[in-house]
Amino acid sequence: MCWTNYIAIPLVLKKPLRVYKVGTLSIFCGFISLFRDFRYRESQTMPTVKINPKFTRCNLFVPGYKPQMWDTFYIHEGYHSYLTEEMAKYSMNEYDDIGVFEIPAGATVYVNYRHREIVSTDIRYLGSLKE
């Protein structure tokens, strides 16, 4: 999962936020995220990471058409999650599991509301989603 959006505004959470990740449950290390193979143990808060949005200006030139330009921000680092259970279910396949996580108050986040994705500086694994 690579977070992209046309704006990148950092928000600091005033209260904890529940989010969801797609990955694999493991009896040895809790939950393994599909994104970057991060490993999470239940109730363990992960180390704080720094997030640096990268800016890119894209140009599209097609002969006979008006040139188009758009700006995009990319975020590769940080803890990538989904805001809703439905979006996590939509992004998984039959072999994946969904983990429930909490972004603690005070964490910095970047939100893409259109894709219901969020990137945070801190996160804690709460357990697997029970269906």
Put a short name on every predicted segment.
Residues 1-79, 83-131:
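Conserved NAD+-utilizing ADP-ribose enzyme module
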